Structure formats: structure tokens, C-alpha cells
Design a protein with these regions (language model features):
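Conserved N-terminal phosphate-binding loop of PLP-dependent enzymes in the Aspartate aminotransferase
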Residues: 1-394
């Protein structure tokens, strides 16, 4: 289908790049004209394993020949096995499955609100992102995502990231939960500090408040740990996840510590397709591949290597303000809008992303190699030089 016909029938809610992707393998994708691209932001954060990982493909193919969907009024082995894997690799509790990060966060919001009738306020962070459904978008601390959707649900307040004193001033006995990402993704790749994370946990303990960590983007090995909270000496009470958990298949989930598992009862929450056997089989394959292929170690090692290369660029170009992030979730903040750099890289067959207007977001597959990193760094530097030369001509 040509892009003009596509645009005629598909609602225009995305700013699309002018390429039609038809195939992917590893870190490479191909368009409908046969051109190959190096994808350094696969699946918008949902491609931690790269495209079409062989073990994920095999698991999906096997499951689809057996049964495609099982309603949640019956038992489903794949769902149970994936839940067991998640709990064994995090903290004791139970898991609810859905289809996306927004749904996972909505479920977490329902759980913390239902726990205590006198605790309804949820504190999130400014510049956060939690999804586009009505409660999740209200939890998102960016007014641009709220515009036009009023009246929004009440009960949400927003704290500055890493501002411990502000957080302390906002806490009271009516706060049901603190909810935030260990690294703000859409907010510009801003890691939460050790001090803020520790204070959040302590304040939750002091006020009988639940700590909800949104690991939709930071989870599944992205930061060099299976979940980013594992870099801190802290455990959440509720953990949300999605994106890369399915290796490209839609899936979402939230896990809850054992002591809070009886809050949601039959009929209080549900999802028709949540825990679908195909999605859960893919999730099992993803977690097993991460362990079998030592991908957490690779994410840490390659994350350090990529960060060093970005810091080297920063030392050469004054338009690079800061490099930040954890593992292979890195951002390079510029003093100029990043969209044109992304376009220059696209022309050179490298796919990148710009978030928060000036932050280049680099989140390659966690099995990335030094060779691929070097290639992308070269292209980014060429794009910067092109942009600088263009600016001098104005």
C-alpha cells in the first residue's frame, strides 16, 4: 500500500517517518524498496531483543499451532509459567496480565485506590509518562498530553523528579501511592537518583503508602538489570511492565507484593486478552533468552561503551549539553532541537528518536555489539556536522 492510501484510512495520531518498514531481523529493518536501516530505537522501546529474535519466533510459531486464545475463566499454562518467571526474578507476589503499558498502569492505579477508602491521592513526577488512557494520561506529568481531554480524573499531584524536599512536603496520610519511572523516558532520559529513590521508599513506609514503579520502558534488561529498580537498594510494592516483555508481541503486566494480592478480587479487574498464550509464550522466550545469552551483562558493558562514545562526542561539540542514562537507556541532550539530527541520520539509514524536543534517545537492542555502536556514532557525528554547516550558512 502506498503511503497516500494509508493516510486516507488510518487516523492521523502519529508523526510518521516517510518509510514503510516491511521486514526486520536483529538490529536491521528493511523498507518496501529494499533499503536496509540500522534500528537504534527498535519498537519505540519494545524491541530490547531486536527484531524477530529466533527463540521468540520459535515460541510464537509453536504456540499458534496449539491454541491462540484462552479466556481467563480457564487456566492457561503459558500465563502461569511467565508469572512464575517474573516473580522468581523480582519479589514474592502475584502478576496480572494485560496488553499494554497504559493498561498495566491503569491496573496499578485501580489497585492502590481500592486498597484504602481514605487514601486516594497518587503522586507522580513532572515530565513523567505513564500512558494515553484517561487515568494514565492524567498520571503523566506533562500538560501537553492533557490538553483537550478535560475533565480529567482527580487525585493526581506532581512532584519534581529528584526533589526530595518537595516530595516530603507533599506527603500526607491521604496519599495512596507514589508512582514513577526509575528513568524518565519521554521526559528526556532522566535517571532517578539513589537519594530520591531511598526517600520515596522511606516515605511510603512512614505513611503506609504504596510505591509503584513504572518499568514499562526501563524493564526487561534495558538498563543492565532485568528491572531498573534492581540498581537500587529498594523494592516497589507494585511493578508495572510491558513493551519488550513480549519481544514485539503486545503484552502488559503488573506484579504486586504478596501482602497486597487480595485487594483486587474476581470481578474488580480484568482483561479479555490479558495473559494470551501467544503473548505469554513470547514473554517466556524473552526472559529465557536474556538469561541464556547473558544479555544483562552485555547491556551493562555495551551501555558503558556507548556512553563513553557519546561523552567523546560531547567533548568535541558544544551543542551537546549532557549525556545521561543507565545501561542501554541513554539520552544525549542538545542545545538545539534534535528532530533535524534524527532526519539526517534517517538519510544515512540509521533510525533514532528525539524526545523532549532536544534529547536524542538511544535505546538499541540489548544484544548490540561494539561494531554497531561505532557505526551509529559515526553517523551521528556526520549528522551533527551537517547541521552545524547548515546553521553557519543561515
Amino acid at each position: 500500500m502506498d503511503q497516500k492510501t494509508f493516510d486516507k484510512y488510518v487516523l492521523n495520531t502519529y508523526t510518521r517517518q516517510p518509510i514503510t518498514i516491511v521486514k526486520g531481523q536483529g538490529m536491521a529493518v528493511w523498507d518496501d524498496k529494499g533499503r536496509e536501516y540500522l534500528d537504534f530505537f527498535p519498537g519505540f522501546g519494545a524491541g530490547n531483543m531486536g527484531h524477530c529474535h529466533p527463540k521468540v519466533v520459535e515460541a510464537i510459531q509453536k504456540q499458534v499451532t496449539e491454541i491462540i486464545h484462552v479466556p481467563n475463566v480457564y487456566y492457561n499454562n503459558a500465563q502461569g509459567e511467565l508469572a512464575k518467571l517474573i516473580i522468581e526474578n523480582t519479589f514474592d507476589g502475584q502478576v496480572f496480565f494485560c496488553n499494554s503499558g497504559a493498561e498495566a498502569n491503569e491496573g496499578a492505579i485501580k489497585l492502590v485506590r481500592k486498597r484504602n477508602p481514605n487514601k486516594k491521592t497518587i503522586i507522580t513526577l513532572k515530565d513523567s509518562f505513564h500512558g494515553r488512557t484517561i487515568a494514565a494520561v492524567t498520571a503523566t506529568g506533562q500538560p501537553v498530553y492533557h490538553d483537550g481531554f478535560d475533565p480529567l480524573p482527580g487525585g493526581f499531584e506532581y512532584c519534581e523528579a529528584n526533589n526530595v524536599e518537595m516530595l516530603k512536603s507533599m506527603m500526607n496520610e491521604h496519599v495512596a501511592a507514589l508512582m514513577f519511572e526509575p528513568v524518565l523516558g519521554e521526559g528526556g532520559i532522566v535517571p532517578i537518583t539513589v537519594e530520591f529513590m531511598a526517600a520515596a521508599r522511606q516515605l511510603c513506609d512512614d505513611y503506609d503508602t504504596l510505591l509503584v514503579l513504572d518499568e514499562v520502558q526501563t524493564g526487561i534488561g534495558r538498563t543492565g538489570k532485568l528491572f531498573a529498580y534492581q540498581h537500587f537498594d529498594v523494592e516497589p510494592d507494585v511493578l508495572t511492565m510491558a513493551k519488550s516483555l513480549g519481544g514485539g508481541i503486545p503484552i502488559g503486566a503488573f506484579s504486586v507484593k504478596r501482602e497486597y494480592c487480595d485487594i483486587l478480587k474476581p470481578g474488580s479487574h480484568g482483561s479479555t486478552f490479558g495473559g494470551n498464550p501467544i503473548a505469554c509464550s513470547a514473554g517466556i522466550a524473552v526472559l529465557n533468552a536474556i538469561a541464556d545469552e547473558n544479555l544483562l551483562e552485555n547491556a551493562l558493558k555495551m551501555g558503558n561503551y556507548l556512553k563513553e562514545k557519546l561523552e567523546a562526542l560531547k567533548s568535541k561539540y558544544s551543542i551537546i549539553k549532557e549525556v545521561r542514562g543507565i545501561g542501554l537507556m541513554l539520552g544525549m541532550e542538545l542545545t538545539i532541537p534534535g528532530a533535524e539530527i534524527v532526519q539526517q541520520c534517517l538519510k544515512k539509514k540509521v533510525l533514532l528518536n528525539c524526545t523532549h524536543k532536544t534529547v536524542l534517545r538511544l535505546m538499541p537492542a540489548i544484544n548490540v555489539t561494539k561494531f554497531k555502536i561505532d557505526k551509529v556514532i559515526k553517523v551521528i557525528e556526520e549528522a551533527i556536522n551537517t547541521q552545524l554547516a547548515w546553521g553557519q550558512q543561515l
